[in-house]
């Protein structure tokens, strides 16, 4: 395995865990229902998806900025859905929230964390992808 996919995967795991914990409710709600090792928090699902997409993009010779932008957009959507699941498990399960009410809580809480982690992922993944010294040597 080359270093680029491994670095992208580890970056995805780290930033997903950071983003979901940052955006999650932390004030007196049941934090035990969603652990740090739960699938939506850990980020293994988007990590595998992004590795597959990057392999497809590489075969199509897509520009690196476009690759990083598409992967960042998909990851941001995943993070928003993970925040929804986390809020639903920690807060909404103890009360009667409609899906619209959950979204009104999740969207404002997610904007800053998704923007910051998305910018970090975009820049880091673009730098990783454009680096040629990490290419597999035959």
Residue ranges and their predicted role:
Residues 47, 66-91, 113-116:
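Hydrophobic alpha-helical membrane segments
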